[in-house]
């Protein structure tokens, strides 16, 4: 009997769960944002080119419907990110963990986002990507360099990952869906 109830609940949630959450995926160019999105969505690595503008995909994960906006990370496109902030419940920040030269730039972009009125209630998932490479900074090192300890008004989580293999992506998404309802 319990099994049939859980099947019924699953079907009910699939068709009648109207909860939909807007998620933006941001990061500097070449961080792996689009690769991350499609590895999560399709569980495969797709050939990518630099994103000009945005990609939009709907993704259902653990009965939670996510509208995922993948935003281009080139300098000129970063100035348009704030146009996507309205009604955003979660931000996924993808960082190239080998890019030591631009840590201060990503820190500046992160804190600019956190200060924006339309993201006041958003949760932040930070993927420390490219952990498969030998010179990758650990999540602990990135946390220190980005001064994550100073984030007081947002729930956040930093997750080591490799978008090419998928390592760490599901753990990060588990954190996101478990916290998105609370935002």
UniProtKB/Swiss-Prot annotation:
GO biological process: intracellular protein transport; protein localization to Golgi membrane; vesicle-mediated transport
Entry GO MF terms: GTP binding; GTPase activity
Organism: Dictyostelium discoideum
Function: May bind and exchange GTP and GDP.
Protein name: ADP-ribosylation factor-like protein 5
Cellular component per GO, a single term: cytoplasm
Pfam family, one: Arf
SUPFAM superfamilies referenced in this protein's UniProt entry, alphabetically: P-loop containing nucleoside triphosphate hydrolases
Residues reported to bind GTP: 27-34, 70-74, 129-132
Protein family: Belongs to the small GTPase superfamily. Arf family.
Assigned keywords, A-Z: GTP-binding, Nucleotide-binding
InterPro entries per the UniProt record, alphabetical: P-loop_NTPase (IPR027417), Small_GTP-bd (IPR005225), Small_GTPase_ARF (IPR024156), Small_GTPase_ARF/SAR (IPR006689)
């Amino acid at each position: 009997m319990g099994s049939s109830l859980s099947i019924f609940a699953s079907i009910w949630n699939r068709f009648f769960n109207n909860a939909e959450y807007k998620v933006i995926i941001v990061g500097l160019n070449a961080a792996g944002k689009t690769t991350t999105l499609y590895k999560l969505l399709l569980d495969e690595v797709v050939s990518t080119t630099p994103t000009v503008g945005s990609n939009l995909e709907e993704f259902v994960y653990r009965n939670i419907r996510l509208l995922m906006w993948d935003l281009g990370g080139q300098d000129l496109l970063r100035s348009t990110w704030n146009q996507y902030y309205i009604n955003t419940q979660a931000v996924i920040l993808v960082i190239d963990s080998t890019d030591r030269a631009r840590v201060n730039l990503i820190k500046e972009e992160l804190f600019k986002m956190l200060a924006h009125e339309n993201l006041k209630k958003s949760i932040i998932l930070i993927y420390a990507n490219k952990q498969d490479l030998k010179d990758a900074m650990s999540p602990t090192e990135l946390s220190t360099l980005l001064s994550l300890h100073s984030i007081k008004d947002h729930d956040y989580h930093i997750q080591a990952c490799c978008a090419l293999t998928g390592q760490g992506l599901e753990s990060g998404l588990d954190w996101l869906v478990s916290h998105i309802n609370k935002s």
